[in-house]
């Protein structure tokens, strides 16, 4: 299945000069959505994953069904002020400054093998901050999976030696 057939391209959104890749049509098509989830589940199967971690918001959309299919838990990564219990945080650079991500301080147990799942790998800032928090909690990042990679933004360089899977390249 060619998943790119289910990605809408919106020029100059959210600002002039940006090409936005919208996964909404993929999610709206049960066959395409299921296919994408199964591809990530297949990638994860041999990695002995204990926990899926997904950054808000579209990491939830992709990561939760993967966790469900694998029969394991899901831990959310959120912006500050969105999680009710004790959190840890990591900063990451954005185009115009610094932003922060958080996760519950007890989300990952030492030694747990974690797969990070998100919709998009762009500059790599989100995944870098997520990796930092998982490792601070003693987790092992066994891999990363993305629906889309924007190749020209070089997020792959931020991932470095971590194993990863991408379903579509732009």
Curated annotation (Swiss-Prot):
Pfam families per record: Pribosyltran (PF00156)
Localization, UniProt: Cytoplasm
An annotated GO BP: purine ribonucleoside salvage
InterPro entries: Ade_phspho_trans (IPR005764), PRibTrfase_dom (IPR000836), PRTase-like (IPR029057), UPRTase/APRTase (IPR050054)
Pathway: Purine metabolism; AMP biosynthesis via salvage pathway; AMP from adenine: step 1/1
SUPFAM superfamilies: PRTase-like
Function field: Catalyzes a salvage reaction resulting in the formation of AMP, that is energically less costly than de novo synthesis.
Name by which UniProt lists this protein: Adenine phosphoribosyltransferase
Natural source organism: Streptococcus sanguinis (strain SK36)
Lineage of source species: Bacteria, Bacillati, Bacillota, Bacilli, Lactobacillales
Gene coding for it: apt
